Amino acid sequence: MAIVGLGTDIAEIERVEKALSRSGDAFAERILSQSEFEKYQELKQKGRFLAKRFAAKEAASKALGTGIAHGVTFHDFTISNDENGKPMLTLSGKALELSKKSDIANIHLTISDERHYAVATVIFES
């Protein structure tokens, strides 16, 4: 196995909360997949959840080498958690297509947050 992509992103939670207050759920719908949006709607700390998902998706797009561009959208990345709470990243759409071209076999995702910031790192291995 070899690392074929590495991406990290940091999001300011307050900035995400301000975007939510301006545009409401429209901002969340732009970032989140359907399953993520359903979970988001149940939460009290929506801004924190969205900041972590935003950072993870930006990190994944950087690891892919495209950013959110060239046909890759936020909806191409879905973050869920396994039974132990470990974050899991699933690719779809253009991101999945590009990952197959790069022979990506393993995806590693870590997400962390503290009072002001959320940070995520993604590693793609062949």
UniProtKB/Swiss-Prot annotation:
Needed co-factor(s): Mg(2+)
Location relative to the cell: Cytoplasm
First-listed, main subcellular location of the protein, grouped into a coarse class: cytoplasm
Pfam families in the cross-refs: ACPS
Top-level enzyme category: transferase
Gene Ontology annotations of biological process type: fatty acid biosynthetic process
Keywords: Cytoplasm, Fatty acid biosynthesis, Fatty acid metabolism, Lipid biosynthesis, Lipid metabolism, Magnesium, Metal-binding, Transferase
Alphabetized Gene3D superfamilies for the sequence: 4'-phosphopantetheinyl transferase domain
Disulfide bridges in this chain: none
One GO MF term attached to the UniProt entry: holo-[acyl-carrier-protein] synthase activity
GO CC, alphabetical: cytoplasm
EC numbers on record: 2.7.8.7
InterPro entries associated with the record: 4-PPantetheinyl_Trfase_dom, 4-PPantetheinyl_Trfase_dom_sf, ACPS, Ppantetheine-prot_Trfase_dom
Top-level division of the source organism's lineage: Bacteria
The reaction(s) this protein catalyses: apo-[ACP] + CoA = holo-[ACP] + adenosine 3',5'-bisphosphate + H(+)
Known role: Transfers the 4'-phosphopantetheine moiety from coenzyme A to a Ser of acyl-carrier-protein.
Family (UniProt): Belongs to the P-Pant transferase superfamily. AcpS family.
Protein name: Holo-[acyl-carrier-protein] synthase
